[in-house]
Amino acid sequence: MDIDPYKEFGATVELLSFLPSDFFPSVRDLLDTASALYREALESPEHCSPHHTALRQAILCWGELMTLATWVGNNLQDPASRDLVVNYVNTNMGLKIRQLLWFHISCLTFGRETVLEYLVSFGVWIRTPPAYRPPNAPILSTLPETTVVRRRDRGRSPRRRTPSPRRRRSQSPRRRRSQSRESQC
């Protein structure tokens, strides 16, 4: 089966493959970041978002993989075989986990649309011949600052008019919208 873990989030393995392997922080750094930013939501029994669920699954998979690696390390007598297994896990599986963790942490931090925009921008930048591209790659944290924000009141005239005397404002106090969830997801 060829399963793309990013498909339901609007991305693909190919889209993430434009980012070089050294772009992604270490698994330890990503786990620390996830814990620092989203520990409460990740440990909560409530469903917060598909990104939280995917992040939980990636963290659990990494834990199981480390358990297996420890077992292999303790039970393989041949140092060369042990090194092959460790290198394979770190190179192949480690990269996939680092990509997954980075993607979901970034989506929770910056928003899915911003992350997808970044991946497309970086993909275009990296495929453009060096002579024709800007010297610096796009930076994820700067994308929201350069995004165009449209005003809500596009149909209104810029000058506000005072209400006509016929219309009276309601005497009841305005109601605040209360959050439907108490946990912070």
From Swiss-Prot:
Residues 157-179 are annotated as: 3 X 8 AA repeats of S-P-R-R-R-[PR]-S-Q. Sequence repeats lie at residues 157-163, 164-171, 172-179. Residues 149-178 have a biased composition (Basic residues). It is found in: Virion; Host cytoplasm. Phosphorylated by host SRPK1, SRPK2, and maybe protein kinase C or GAPDH. Phosphorylation is critical for pregenomic RNA packaging. Protein kinase C phosphorylation is stimulated by HBx protein and may play a role in transport of the viral genome to the nucleus at the late step during the viral replication cycle. Disulfide bonds: none annotated. Residues 179-185 are annotated as: RNA binding. The modification Phosphoserine is found at S157, S164, S172. Self assembles to form an icosahedral capsid. Most capsids appear to be large particles with an icosahedral symmetry of T=4 and consist of 240 copies of capsid protein, though a fraction forms smaller T=3 particles consisting of 180 capsid proteins. Entering capsids are transported along microtubules to the nucleus. Phosphorylation of the capsid is thought to induce exposure of nuclear localization signal in the C-terminal portion of the capsid protein that allows binding to the nuclear pore complex via the importin (karyopherin-) alpha and beta. This is Capsid protein. It comes from Hepatitis B virus genotype A2 subtype adw (isolate Japan/Nishioka/1983).
